[in-house]
Amino acid sequence: CTNLELFKLKSNSDGALRQNKPLTVGYVGSIGVWYLFEEALDYYKLIQEVVPDAQLHIINKGGHTYINECLNNSGIDKGSVLLETRDHLDVAHAMQSMDVGIFMIKPLYSKIASMPTKLGEFLGCGVPCICNNGIGDMSDIINDRGVGVVLDSFDTDEKKESIMYLLKLIKDPLIKNRCRETALKYFSLEDGVNSYNNIYKSLDEKL
């Protein structure tokens, strides 16, 4: 579940400031054992081949040394990357200014039934997502609702094809509202609490 009172759409007045700004790809959170951070960087590099002035905004706590090593090895111009740490409230504000969120997760058995919190946070802010297949219901939600790109493999040709779709998706005037509606449908904290309460009540009645 996601706090959709915090992770919400940017106001129209703030949104007007986004005009004429470069495409911003956002990476928020861990780069640890479950995440394929280098695959995310590779995808960003391919985006830059199509949109040379695209920016990468990374928000992370505790992994900056490893991130900088990966950036150096990738050949990405660090002038196009903003790497920083923010508190929880500021993270939500920063995500509102991103055009697309990216995260790649190792499709391990332990992740089959999981759902990344950051998906709900990005969608709550009206930001479509790029991710890989094999993680919970994430692929079905993104594909069925048209709120991002799901990679079935890390093949370069598939990535390039998905980028063309992604760039069209970002220009869709309805995409932000569609992302927000998807977050409300699948990630509402209030609905999640109510669901758990109903489960506990039903268990109590059986005891």
Model regions and ranges:
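Conserved donor-binding/catalytic core segment of Leloir-type glycosyltransferases
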Residues: 17-44, 57
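Nucleotide-activated donor-binding/catalytic signature segment of Leloir-type glycosyltransferases, i.e.
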Residues: 22, 60, 65-95, 100
